[in-house]
């Protein structure tokens, strides 16, 4: 089965190679999110990442859309994706990282760590 996959995610070369090796019968195109082209979106059967809604809505044969965010609401509006298109998202993928960040920020604020850092930086100048 041959599928055309557009990947709009920030992947390094190793991740690209791993993705291509996992399904060698698929054809891949990789674009940075800020460099997505309409012809690539129209070409794709599968889109991984948040290509612009205005481009996605013109692709009437897309079979799978993987949102890179937890809330793909803009893509779920009527007429954006074909009715038979499978939609998946990143719900829960960032939970641990966000929790760790929030805890670190809270501790930093409570202990005035940012004030200490700023004072240390002023002495180094």
List each language-model region with its residue ranges.
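Phosphate-binding beta-alpha-beta segment of Rossmann-like dinucleotide-binding domains, i.e.
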Residues: 83-125
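An N-terminal-biased, well-structured beta-alpha scaffold segment characteristic
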Residues: 1-88
């Amino acid at each position: 089965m041959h599928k055309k996959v557009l990947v709009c995610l920030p992947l390094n070369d190793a991740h690209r190679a791993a993705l291509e090796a996992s399904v060698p019968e698929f054809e891949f195109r990789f674009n940075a999110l800020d460099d997505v082209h309409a012809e690539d979106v129209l070409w794709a059967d599968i889109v991984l990442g948040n290509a612009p809604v205005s481009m996605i809505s013109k692709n009437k044969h897309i079979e799978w859309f993987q949102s890179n965010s937890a809330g793909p609401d803009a893509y779920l509006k009527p007429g954006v994706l074909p009715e038979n298109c499978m939609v998946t998202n990143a719900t829960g993928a960032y939970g641990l990282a966000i929790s760790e960040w929030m805890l670190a920020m809270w501790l930093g604020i409570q202990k005035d760590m940012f004030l200490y850092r700023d004072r240390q930086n002023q002495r180094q100048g």
